[in-house]
Structure formats: structure tokens, C-alpha cells
Amino acid sequence: MSELSRVSVTALKGVGEAMAEKLAKVGLETLQDVLFHLPLRYQDRTRIVPIGALRPGQDAVIEGVVSGADVVMGKRRSLLVRLGDGTGVVSLRFYHFSNAQKESMKRGTHLRCFGEARPGASGLEIYHPEYRAITGDEPAPVEQTLTPIYPTTEGLTQQRLRQLCQQSLAMLGPESLPDWLPEELARDYQLAPLDDAIRYLHHPPADADVEELALGHHWAQHRLAFEELLTHQLSQQRLRESLRSQRAPALPVAKKLPKQFLANLGFAPTGAQQRVGKEVAYDLSQPEPMLRLIQGDVGSGKTVVAALAALQALEAGYQVALMAPTEILAEQHYINFQRWLEPLGVGVAWLAGKLKGKARVASLEQIAGGTPMVVGTHALFQDEVQFKNLALVIIDEQHRFGVQQRLALRKKGVGGLMCPHQLIMTATPIPRTLAMSAYADLDTSILDELPPGRTPVNTVLVADSRRLEVVERVRAACAEGRQAYWVCTLIEESEELTCKAAETTYEELSSALGDVRVGLIHGRMKPAEKAAIMAEFKQGALQLLVATTVIEVGVDVPNSSLMIIENPERLGLAQLHQLRGRVGRGSAVSHCVLLYHPPLSQIGRQRLGIMRETNDGFVIAEKDLELRGPGEMLGTRQTGLLQFKVADLMRDADLLPAVRDAAQALLERWPQHVSPLLDRWLRHGQQYGQV
């Protein structure tokens, strides 16, 4: 049998060209990819819950008889179906429904449903449940194993993903998926066989310890996390070694431009900015490529340090490229750098995906012709982008870019021979205990001081039952001339459903706040649409912005002083901290309301309590590491510090010492296993030798 890493998903039944394209969107190109695409969480559909025992926020299978189905004309037309089982009654609410669907819900119909119970206008409600009619006297069987919920994308249902996993699991074996951890190593570190771990995680038995799985502490997760962290460690060592052998332009410490820049800035850099600025200046003056990470809390002034680094290269006559992960953020950097550099006589060019036709050609010509400062998005990675003499690359939010993209920029250095220096900025604080393991290939600087004028944000926890009070608070803030964000984080495994939730919230708030100008921004809108809405919000034409978490990185609207975050219990603390950093940028006192769905677990309450107690990102990251709440510890994997499939740096911190030892042993005794591991876990793994 072929190795599954070489078998395309098109070998699976039901996967044609169109489905293969959808699968590629979530990184699934081979059967090995499918098997390593692990569930985000599990649903227990192995038992039927009496309707009378349902609690708000609970996912459950229920069975009952329809007592009525009516089309209700509220803010949105919906179908409301009443379902009872003798212990209680629940309402099923459908916003998108057909006449046939309405007809199938006649009084007396016996239904089995699955969904999340939520408080609604008619008591407990389940929005858009999965359901089927039950006929005959025989009770329909329930599921035998826990039901996996996978990360997905538009047009790719959970049902379809489960079928594809089922087919792939049927082909799983030691020949089709070799175990690259030598037996002796696996024995020393008490690691289970690879195929056992994968089978278990796709189909945990009904009696599996759900809490242990939610925590990520199960032996099967432990096995895969260990292998992934081991591979990451090996790749970092290769990166470091290859970097030491490369040359970069040595840039003398600049005098003239930084002096003018700081004089125009209007405020003195903080002590932390000066210290980190010196570290960067020293690195740039060396003939080896700098590879430095600046960690700075939200609002700590990383961009000013980046500008000082840029001026050192610019004064020496070289080009600088600054790259951001989204067009909104890149455009913000472009505006800032234009404002700062053009008075110094330094030209700034712009390149993003939305730039088309003549404007794009003109921009490419400027870059090739040597325009000193270039700001853009991923578009800067493309082959057709040629620099004249690039000496420094500044990357904002490193975790959004893969290793192959870093490679592409490396190759754009001076004359293609020298390697540009790289300065990477992140506002995702890494606990100090993990920084060394997270970025073994980078030198790290920390900006641990906020510039004067930043006001701490007051954070409060409010239960969803008080939603109307929160809406009134938004109305009052807007009436005072302030602006507000309302962030929807409803459903973590599906961008499509989260966007629908945002649309529903937008309609509800527009209706409730008739006189307030409300905008909507979510991940499925085109970049141009997002940029237009963002610009309106920034200019004050919109007072309230309903958004999904697309706004978490770097958006700067100083007049916004109120943020509402729905379902904060579903997000990692680092991500909540990023979102909260969008307010408190002006002089007004700012507030963040965490609108949660009770009941909160004890750890959930503790975690959200940390957000209330502190505005310090590093403290928050350390506390997150200590708590690791069950099912709620969304650490660095999801917030994007490093794109791990299984491992989570915070959760798996205790594995790191053993992982380092195992990496050493593998390099010394089984070096032939290193490349297959890199290929398995890191796309383009073979290129690690050249990064």
C-alpha cells in the first residue's frame, strides 16, 4: 500500500475537483493530511437528554413530539416549532426554512434533534438544530462513539468530513503511515503507537474521558503533540545552523535620520523602546543576518522601534520591506510610515493584493527602481516582486506567515546573494518560560513599558441574560459621541457560521438601536469591503462596528472606548487580550464587557476573572499557562503564535525538556528519521535546510 502522504484526497469516494479545492482551503491535500486534521472538540450524542433536564449552553440530543409549528414575524421571519417529551418543552427556531420543512413539522411528528439550548423569547430555544423524524415503534440507535467536530470551511460539512476521515482510517496501518519515532525512543518517553493515537482521536469510545480530551491531556493527544514539538525543535535547530552560514549587509548605526524622526515624533521613546532599539541597531551593524523577535504588549510602541530599524537601513542606502498579515493593518502601517518618512525625504511604496492593473504595474516598477520603503501584505512574497537592494524585512505578527513565505523573502535580498535582516513583531505575549522553545531560531526582545497616555481598560463580566442592559450602554456611549465594537465569537469550528451569527447580531442591534449608525465586518467579506467599512468607522461615519475576530490585530481607532465580546469563554486569554487592545487608545476611559453564557465552569470564571484584574499581556499569558482550563484553554495553537496542528505550547510546556533531549538523541543516533518528520509535520519541510 502507498504511503498516505503520497495519496491525493481525490482517491476518496465523493471527492472530485470542486471538493478537493474546498479541502485544500483547510490544508487537506493528501490522506495523511486528513488523518492529522483532528477534531477541535467532541459532542456526546451517545445518550438522549430529557428536555426538562436541559440547561442553557448545553449541547444535547433530545427526542419529543411536535405540539405546534408557527411562522413568527419578529425582527426576522422565523419558524418556531414547540417540542415536548413529558418532562418539559423546548422551542426549535429556524431562520432559513422552506415550506416543505414547515410541512414536515406537523403536530404529532416525533423528532430527534441535536443542538445547543439557549435562553430565548419563548424559554429555552435551539437555533437551527440537526433533526430527523422518527418513525415506527423501534427506537433509533444513538451514536456508539463521541462525535468529532472538525475545523471546517464553507461548503464542507461536518458530515462530509467525518465520511472522509472514515475512509482514510480504513487505509491506516504501519506501512501506509510509518512511525518515525524509533521504538527505543517511544519506550523511553512512554509514547503510544502512532496509528493507535490517530484512531482514538477520530473516534473516542462513549466512555472516553471527555474532560481529559478537552484539556488536551489524553495519551493519544500527548503522543501526537510530542512528535510535533520534536519536529519543531529539529526544524529550529536547522534554521539556526543554516542562518549562521549566511551573510547580510552590515549597516552602520544611523545618526541623521533617527534624530530628525524623533524630533518630529512629538514624544520621547520609553526606556524599553530605547533599550530594544539599541539591541536591534547592534544586530543590523553585523554581517550575519539579524533574526530578532520583538514581543510587545498591545500599544507598547513596537512600530516606533521598527521605524528606527528601518531608518538605519535607509540611511545606509538600502531598501526596507514591512509586511502585515491583513490589508487593513498594512494600510495602517503605510499611512503611519508615509507620515513619518516623507518629511525626511524618504519615498514610501505600497503593494497589496487589491492593487490591480496600471496601479500595480507602477508599484512594481517603483519597488524594482529602488523606492526606499515598501509596505504591503503577502503580495510582497510573489515572484514578480523584485527589489533593487533589500536589506531589512520587518514582519508584523509573524505567526500569520509560514516558513515558505519567509524563504521567499530571504531570496529577495541584495542581488539575491545576501540575506536580508529580519525583524519580527508580535503582540501575542509568550510566557517567558516558553519563549526559548517557541522561537529557538530567534533572538527575543521585550517591550515591557506602555507609552504615557495609554489608559487601562476597565473590564467587566456580564451574563447574557442582561443583554438588553448592555445594548442600552452601547446606545449611551454612542450618544456621547464615542464609538464601540461588538465582537461575535459564536462558533469556533466554522467561519461560515460565525459570520452568520455576526449578521444576525448586526440585524438585531440595527433594529434595537434605530438611531445608531451600525456597520458589519466579517471574514467572508472581500478585502475591499472590509477596508471600506473600516475606513467609515475610523472616520466616525459609523458609531458601532459588529465584527468577528478579524479586528483583533492592530486596528487603531482612538475614539472607540467600548467593546462588547460575546462568548468570551470560547476564546483564549491571549486573543481576548488582543481584542481588548482595540479600545483604550485615546484619552477617554474605556470599557470592555465580556458577555458570557452561563453556566461558566470554575476555571472559565477564573480565566475571565484574570481579564478583569489585569491589562498586562505577559501576566495574562503566564496565568493562562498555569490554569489550562478544560476545553477552554485555547492557547497559542488557535491564537496563532505558531501554527501547530496538535501541540499547544502553553498546555504542553511540561513536555518541552523531554522533547529537547529526544531531538538531540534523534540527531545523534537516528539522523535518517529527521527529514521524514519535517516532511510530515511542516509543509515544504525539505526546504528547512535552506531557510
Predicted segments, located by residue:
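N-terminal pre-Walker A segment at the start of P-loop NTPase domains
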Residues: F267-G277
